[in-house]
Amino acid sequence: MSSLYTAHLGNNADLIRAVSDFYVASGQQVADVTYGKGAFWRKTDTTRFSLHVSDIVTCPDALHDFRDLPYKTGSIDHVIFDPPYMHNAGRPMVEERYGNATTKGMYHDDILVLYAQGMKEARRVLRRDGLLWVKCKDEIESSRQRMSVVEIHDIAVRILQMTVKDLFILVPSSIPPVQHKKQYHARKSHSYLWLFKK
């Protein structure tokens, strides 16, 4: 197995493959509670563990709200949590591209509430020492820096009493052009994947 580094160049599927190869043992129970179209798992061999998928919109056989999961308390080894954080109220193109049916018209603080609710429920279903994987991205909202990576850490550690297992920084191999020519802050092209231990 090659070394795993915190900084990763590529896409979500590349990162998830590397992290799951390192952290997910054969036969473990993995619940992706924001499955979407399954983009995370396209490059991962999921036959060596039990992958349970659900989504509030895209999984007809498993339409579950991540705030009210169907799993027993303490029954899952890994919960994968990637809620629609790419939002821009009033910009339908952004909301449609990122599947934001549940966050349409929401702002950063509203989405943080969803994170907190989903992470609390994920903690419930995790086994002792189970891992919660949380995807997030910093953003600028109304000309203010919103450091989601810090806010998500505080929810997990201060409120839910979890501990940090790892943090990955994903830098895409290609960056789409921006529409706005005038720049006030550095562009945020990277995202994060937190791993918190129950």
What are these regions (language model features)?
Residues 1-198:
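Class I S-adenosyl-L-methionine-dependent methyltransferase catalytic core
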